[in-house]
Amino acid sequence: TKTEGSFLAEGGGVR
């Protein structure tokens, strides 16, 4: 989820 960065953490974590 938050592996990529903070932006994914906000979006929900696509990865």
Swiss-Prot record:
A GO cellular component entry from the record: extracellular region
Cysteine disulfide partners in this protein: none
Post-translational modification as stated in the protein's UniProt record: Conversion of fibrinogen to fibrin is triggered by thrombin, which cleaves fibrinopeptides A and B from alpha and beta chains, and thus exposes the N-terminal polymerization sites responsible for the formation of the soft clot. The soft clot is converted into the hard clot by factor XIIIA which catalyzes the epsilon-(gamma-glutamyl)lysine cross-linking between gamma chains (stronger) and between alpha chains (weaker) of different monomers. Forms F13A-mediated cross-links between a glutamine and the epsilon-amino group of a lysine residue, forming fibronectin-fibrinogen heteropolymers.
A Gene Ontology biological process term: blood coagulation
Domain of life: Eukaryota
Locations listed in the record: Secreted
Keyword field: Adaptive immunity, Blood coagulation, Coiled coil, Disulfide bond, Hemostasis, Immunity, Innate immunity, Secreted
Main function: Cleaved by the protease thrombin to yield monomers which, together with fibrinogen beta (FGB) and fibrinogen gamma (FGG), polymerize to form an insoluble fibrin matrix. Fibrin has a major function in hemostasis as one of the primary components of blood clots. In addition, functions during the early stages of wound repair to stabilize the lesion and guide cell migration during re-epithelialization. Was originally thought to be essential for platelet aggregation, based on in vitro studies using anticoagulated blood.
The protein's assembly and partners: Heterohexamer; disulfide linked. Contains 2 sets of 3 non-identical chains (alpha, beta and gamma). The 2 heterotrimers are in head to head conformation with the N-termini in a small central domain.
Domain text: A long coiled coil structure formed by 3 polypeptide chains connects the central nodule to the C-terminal domains (distal nodules). The long C-terminal ends of the alpha chains fold back, contributing a fourth strand to the coiled coil structure.
Entry protein name: Fibrinogen alpha chain
Source taxonomy: Eukaryota, Metazoa, Chordata, Craniata, Vertebrata
